[in-house]
Amino acid sequence: PIVLMASLPLTAAPATTQLLHPQFLPTDDQQLRTEKPEQQQLMLVTSYSVVVGSQRQSNQQPIPVTSPLFVRLKGKPMSQGATVREVLISFDGESKSLKKPAFDSTTRTLTLSYPMTQYRVVMDLLRNDTVYCQFLTYANGHIWADLHTGSVRAR
């Protein structure tokens, strides 16, 4: 019998991970992203929910009641090595206590903080387009996170 073998390359392909969705990054005027990122989490959003809460954080007086607003995104990882499954976006009314984007590898949750003025923009994206969430970290401490649509043709 004749045995046919698939042709395999004799050398392995270089282990370079290409950055996905780089066209959605802003210009790098300060040269913060000249090196390859240490981490990229890219998630395709498949579902979302909106939560409007009401809480009092303790029995101590005079702690006020707050009303947090957040959007929970669920999805599937798209980039090589990505494990993100959920994005939790909180909205701050005063934009004074925005927190840096953070990824928890244990819970596979990315946490983002936006000013309240961005809520309508986020909801418009989720209602009308395919949405991706991206999170990048660099050795110099730079962090970038965004929500973006895929490329859409103008009508």
Predicted regions span which residues?
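Acidic, glycine-rich flexible loop segments
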Residues: K96-G150
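Context-gated lysine
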Residues: M5, K36, K74-K76, K96-K100
